[in-house]
Swiss-Prot record:
Protein name: Inner membrane-spanning protein YciB
GO cellular component: plasma membrane
Localisation per UniProt entry: Cell inner membrane
Residues in coiled coil: none
Upper taxonomic lineage: Bacteria, Pseudomonadati, Pseudomonadota, Betaproteobacteria, Burkholderiales
Membrane-topology descriptor: Multi-pass membrane protein
InterPro entries: YciB
Annotated organism of origin: Delftia acidovorans (strain DSM 14801 / SPH-1)
Role according to the record: Plays a role in cell envelope biogenesis, maintenance of cell envelope integrity and membrane homeostasis.
Region spans: Disordered: 180-199
């Protein structure tokens, strides 16, 4: 259900584009994102900071697209959002000495410090590349190709990257399990058999 809510605006944007075109799709994306935030606020009582940022970006660039009747603005929106997320990770690490990924996922994942740093840098680099790739597609191909990439290409690359990150993290989880097993005391003797007592 959460995954559906997360992709709700982009799916509606894609459908609206195929039926009515880029400008109607942009308006639909704005309304859908506002509805998404309202639902999260009412249902869960909390909206993540990046979701507020996403709302601000779609309203700003989507609104500019509709007012200027120029789809260049909406095509820049994904790149700006990617770069904002990447910048947040870098600023947190370099300026505030705080790993934002660890702050978000540290309760669910037990990883060494070097693994968290690698993940943080990897995600920042991924967001930088995705932002640049979005503009390459936007300026070198037609709008229909860009919209298809936005839904299928972007999601596909994200999925591949997440799988790669999961494989990387699994190495450390296996090491933790091995260390825990090595630290486990020897099994108790069968019933009726006493262990030798030290004098």
């Amino acid at each position: 259900m959460k995954l559906l809510i997360d992709f709700f605006p982009i799916i509606l944007f894609f459908v609206a584009f195929k039926v009515w075109g880029i400008y109607t799709a942009t308006a639909v994306a704005i309304v859908a994102t506002i509805a998404q935030i309202a639902y999260l606020r009412v249902r869960h009582g909390k909206v993540e900071p990046m979701q507020w940022v996403s709302l601000g970006v779609i309203v700003l660039f989507g609104g500019a697209t509709l007012l200027a009747h120029n789809d260049t603005f909406i095509k820049w929106k994904p790149s700006v959002l990617y770069w904002l997320m990447g910048s947040a990770l870098l600023i947190g690490q370099l300026v505030f000495r705080k790993n934002l990924l660890r702050s978000v996922m540290g309760a669910q994942l037990q990883l060494p410090d070097n693994a968290w740093r690698t993940l943080n840098w990897s995600w920042a680099a991924f967001f930088a590349v995705m932002g640049a790739l979005n503009l390459v597609i936007a300026y070198r191909f037609d709008t229909d190709t860009w919209v298809n990439f936005k839904l299928f290409g972007g999601m596909g690359l994200m999925l591949v990257f997440v799988i790669g990150q999961a494989i990387y993290m699994s190495r450390f989880m296996q090491e933790d399990k091995g260390e825990a097993a090595a630290a486990t005391p020897d099994a108790l003797p069968p019933p009726g058999v006493q262990q030798d007592k030290q004098p």
